[in-house]
């Protein structure tokens, strides 16, 4: 019972009032999520049937297919490694409910990305409490138009769910809901193993912050964050039992544990991480605003931001020290914190400079989706990955008009060999090569392949890879050797270039052996295909009928 102005209200009234409040909050949250999901799905509309790209085709889709078809949580179709099965289970569930298709995969990932953006929005609200304006909406907009988020939101990779559950765990921790934060961390480490950084940071923070004061309660709160450690430990035990290796396979362990710890490689990787976070894609504008706002906004130095900054720094250091591949997508869990900081810092600027800075930052982020940087970068950092997939699809279709096996490298091999990846209706025989280095090509001279598809996996418009400094550093620390060009390979193996695809500075080539017997076999198959489709001529540029 409650007495209000001389009247007594029954407990049932209070329960109804509380329930009504929670219903309004839930309705608003659902509305925000629905709006974000609708925008993301509509924005990605032309890409919803896009074939699988790179690690999707080589690792995560095969692993998810194992769960879907046979219930195997440790993959047989792909090389097993330390990555937990959380994302793959989500895809298997989506396929079970809506059918095994690329469209189902893309929409399932966009719905997951919408949840991640929504949790990032809630985190931005928490981080900007007490500030004027609506910086949380600015942070959400910056995140959604950023090239890395936009590209990754449709791809079946681990780092998007890692971002969402990192943001959720941090939000719950900042609200002192430690048990719920620990449960979110369990889901996080089952999405990606590097998520273990978050519960370790939270547990240590509690013990350090409350040292000497109520140690019993502090230890109980910190102990919750042993749950995700135990969950990840059980997964590693399962890997050890079924594969004989703690991380699934020894090559993965060597490449991701010992290889990055060389001081030179670590320093270079760290500089690259810092450049991407604070300079690239127009981030230098937000960084400048943050430096200006540091003295003006005490909010940026309070406990909330200290926890967030500690987590962001710990994650960036962890993926730098424990990851052989220099992929920017590993930094996705840092972006909600980064864009919240940029949005809050922009509020400290005078109105006119704030409008100019925000406009320029938005323009840079949107432009970075379509404009490639002048140095080598992973295609998955922006929409360049779509151009690469288009070239793969055209090259696969052109090669499939011939009967011979195609010699090429990953990921082109997966485009040809597995129809589930969306490139061909039927598998085409492949001869997988590790690379296009001179030694690899020289080994083919005794038995040249009938067909080859040659391409580069990175753009280099400023010819950075041709400089002496680049060749020395990457040759010494990354075992880099310049791959042979399509022209060089064609001369070495007595082949001719029959097709070439150019897109945004990227080139892919189809080479055909000039041996008369081999050519006769290939042309007979090609003529049969032309007859099937009623004649036609392959375009020299597109490779389509």
Segments (PLM) and residue ranges:
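Signature aromatic-anchored transmembrane alpha helix within multi-pass, membrane-resident enzymes
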Residues: 16, 26, 30-35, 183, ...
